[in-house]
Amino acid sequence: MQPAMMMFSSKYWARRGFSLDSAVPEEHQLLGSSTLNKPNSGKNDDKGNKGSSKREAATESGKTAVVFSLKNEVGGLVKALRLFQEKRVNMVHIESRKSRRRSSEVEIFVDCECGKTEFNELIQLLKFQTTIVTLNPPENIWTEEEELEDVPWFPRKISELDKCSHRVLMYGSELDADHPGFKDNVYRQRRKYFVDVAMGYKYGQPIPRVEYTEEETKTWGVVFRELSKLYPTHACREYLKNFPLLTKYCGYREDNVPQLEDVSMFLKERSGFTVRPVAGYLSPRDFLAGLAYRVFHCTQYIRHGSDPLYTPEPDTCHELLGHVPLLADPKFAQFSQEIGLASLGASDEDVQKLATCYFFTIEFGLCKQEGQLRAYGAGLLSSIGELKHALSDKACVKAFDPKTTCLQECLITTFQEAYFVSESFEEAKEKMRDFAKSITRPFSVYFNPYTQSIEILKDTRSIENVVQDLRSDLNTVCDALNKMNQYLGI
């Protein structure tokens, strides 16, 4: 048995008269509070005064909005906008649309920056010339810090994964009494070495190469040899496609433990994923956050040699033989990333549901290929006994449905009571997308692959940047189609 492991701010738009569904830090407190962007209430300013909160500052001057309607006549809009100029209200964004109330009127949406006094004076003047549909006064100004202060922290850029990877929950150099290596002082010292390597690693550095001992290589060899016998009849086709490539480019052999740096470079070229070393178990939130960046946290230590076919924790045999071959598949990589993206800023309850779905798909998932059940879960593909069991008549197999799968108990030291099957990765991905819509968040997230950062989609301007990227991609597709029409006569 192997161990495992576009929504907008509803408050923002409700103040504008809309109803839309569903976060974010600057600093992450490693210990203690797990929420974000707390207002500064303890620092002194340059004059020695106690720092006032960002909420108070926003009341004096900040972003606000108003929607008003005008008769559809010449000069009406000019007169209204002149009032903004007179009251020195800066217009940041303006939109117009046909009124839903009267066909003879047009509604104007204005996003602006001003103080409370100026805004109130502007509204009084607008009332004489327009009909106010909805407004967002400065005392209710939306600010990212206020809106997201109760949202659990998550990394906004890939380098912040350094914080996640150092918060190991269990094992590392400290082993439980029932661990096979608990009484082996040599093994415990070796584990401490791997902890030091992982804790010292920073984003952007090459992953340190490890000189594995003869005992470690022998243990790896036993696992590699026995599992390789089962893969042709038990593993999914995507796994079987990539496994020989790992042998060719990353040194996957019975007598050699692959190096994470070589594996990471291989994955980067195949699917955009990379790996980074980790000392042991991470919390579901921290682990899934890595997937959002297409980063897989990977251990470097080898299980204890006294029982090569069992480990109570994820080791490098589990990571390299179970996870890596499928992370090289673009569709599987996207499926993994979308689970990670859905977890960012989600509640503890929703993260646990996502982690359970992850457990029964990416760790213990089954799929159908050519009418036969095949394994794609890493926990199965790195466990001889459970791989045989999951594809036998003795296993309880159910159709994958995130709504029910998330309620299934995850078992660590025994075989699972149930396994979940999907027709394809694409089907599982679509089901997870639908399930993610039920997660309550006051925002949506977008992974920017160019800056390797997470963008918060909270207003029309932030969405516009994403649309620009999509437009560029669509132009490329249209150009390709035009050339096919021209040269191939399609």
Swiss-Prot record:
Effect of residue 41 to Y: Does not affect catalytic activity
The ACT domain, residue ranges: 65-140
Effect of residue 328 to E: Loss of activity
Residues at which Fe cation binds: 318, 323, 363
PROSITE patterns recorded: ACT (PS51671), BH4_AAA_HYDROXYL_1 (PS00367), BH4_AAA_HYDROXYL_2 (PS51410)
Basic and acidic residues bias locations: 43-58
UniProt cross-references to Gene3D superfamilies, sorted A to Z: Aromatic amino acid hydroxylase
InterPro entries from the UniProt entry: ACT-like_dom_sf, ACT_dom, ArAA_hydroxylase, ArAA_hydroxylase_Fe/CU_BS, ArAA_hydroxylase_sf, Aro-AA_hydroxylase_C_sf, Aromatic-AA_hydroxylase_C, Trp_5_mOase
Annotated CDD domains: eu_TrpOH
Pfam families attached to this UniProt entry: Biopterin_H (PF00351)
Phenotype when changing residue 206 to S: Risk factor for bipolar affective disorder; may results in moderately decreased function in serotonin synthesis; decreases solubility; decreases thermal stability; catalytic activity as the wild type
Keywords: Disease variant, Iron, Metal-binding, Monooxygenase, Oxidoreductase, Phosphoprotein, Serotonin biosynthesis
Gene Ontology process terms (BP): aromatic amino acid metabolic process; serotonin biosynthetic process
EC assignment: 1.14.16.4
Top-rank taxon, per record: Eukaryota
Result of changing residue 433 to G: In RNA edited version
Subunit structure of this chain's protein: Interacts with DNAJC12.
Disease per record: Major depressive disorder: A common psychiatric disorder. It is a complex trait characterized by one or more major depressive episodes without a history of manic, mixed, or hypomanic episodes. A major depressive episode is characterized by at least 2 weeks during which there is a new onset or clear worsening of either depressed mood or loss of interest or pleasure in nearly all activities. Attention deficit-hyperactivity disorder 7: A neurobehavioral developmental disorder primarily characterized by the coexistence of attentional problems and hyperactivity, with each behavior occurring infrequently alone.
Similarity comment text for this entry: Belongs to the biopterin-dependent aromatic amino acid hydroxylase family.
Protein name per the record: Tryptophan 5-hydroxylase 2
Organism: Homo sapiens
